[in-house]
Amino acid sequence: LEKGHWVGFPVAFYTPETGFGGGAALGYIYPRLGDRHPSSIMGIGFYTEKNQTVFGMIPELYLENGFHGLIEMGYQKFPDNYWGIGPDTEDEDEEKYTPEVAEGRLLGEVEVRPGLRIGGQYRYRREIILKKEEGGALQDRGLPGSTGGITSGIGILGSYDTRDNRFSSSEGW
């Protein structure tokens, strides 16, 4: 078996919602089953000029028996803007708020035919609103989501992947 290798690169960007931001992505790729489906662990973190913070990590495993699993974990503290509900909001309706989000996903699937996998997943997301404008729409506790909340669920899934390499494919679906 080949040895694994580290990959890493800086992240720099600009969007109107974030301003300038920067951080890094780092990963370890272990080609236990060759180049087609290497197992890996990837992580990213960045910070923006608008005090937004995001961290994420995804360990992903491919086994010889056709099992594929991953655990996705993320954290965000992401000051943002809220305008209201519906298409008739105005720019003056804008109010600032800061949510904090922790989320995760657990996925497991097995290959039933070459390239075809079926399985299940569980997702969890907890959001807390840390800051909101005094007297704004989000101060109204009757507005769904104005205090945050938890979403959680399980589901079935299927995937079809015949790529010759999941990171840099030249053929397949």
Task: Give the label of every model feature segment.
Residues 149-173:
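Loop-centered beta-sheet repeat module
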Residues 2-8, 13-150:
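Gram-negative/organellar outer-membrane beta-barrel architecture
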Residues 1-2, 165:
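Short boundary motifs at domain starts and secondary-structure transition points
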